[in-house]
Amino acid sequence: VNGGSFFVVGSGSKSASNPNQDKIRQILTDEEPLKTSGPYELFNRRVLEHSQEISKFLRDVKAKGKTVIGYGASTKGNIVLNHCNIDEQLIEMIADENPEKWGRVTPGSGITIIPKKQMRELKPDYLFVLIWHFYTEVLTDEKEYVMNGGRIVFGLPRLHIVDKHNYEERLRLGFEEF
């Protein structure tokens, strides 16, 4: 669920297996632009723009007096928190189901981690999802929250909000559509 893998076959020079030279040449040709700074500069620009969009959204929501609780104290999510300079001023706390994390704080951003049950009792205006790669599971688990007026914010892969008006469509589309 949290990664990928490569399948590699190696053989000696006297092996009956022959490498697919056409495929190898095509891969090397396709990867040629990666030897320049262009793709990396474009990626960097997109990351900066996206992190500014996330930060602005959270600042705007907080300026309106709304409550925001993070959802899922994950390593990937913590990278987003630190890159976007998100701290307890923007996200009051983070809900997680792992009891070993409760009462601890996120590295760098210093946001306290609480049980999901406590988050549900607090009824925040927004949940900011830090485990976006579990898109369907989050929506399924928090359907009642959404149907009672809560809003779920996914910052990645693109910033979007799920509410009771678009819940069914977003659930049907799934993570891959973003």
Specify the residue positions occupied by each region the protein language model found.
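Short internal beta-strands
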Residues: E92-E97, V153-G155
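Substrate-recognition/cap helix-loop segment adjacent to the acidic, metal-dependent catalytic center
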Residues: I79-E92
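Flexible, glycine-/basic-rich loop-and-beta segments that form/coincide
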Residues: N2-R46
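A short, well-structured juxtamembrane/interface segment
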Residues: R46-K64
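Glycine-rich adenosine-cofactor-binding loop
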Residues: V61-N82
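Phosphate-bearing ligand-interacting subdomains
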Residues: G110-R172, E176-E177
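Conserved nucleotide-cofactor-binding alpha/beta core module
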Residues: P99-V105, K117-Q118
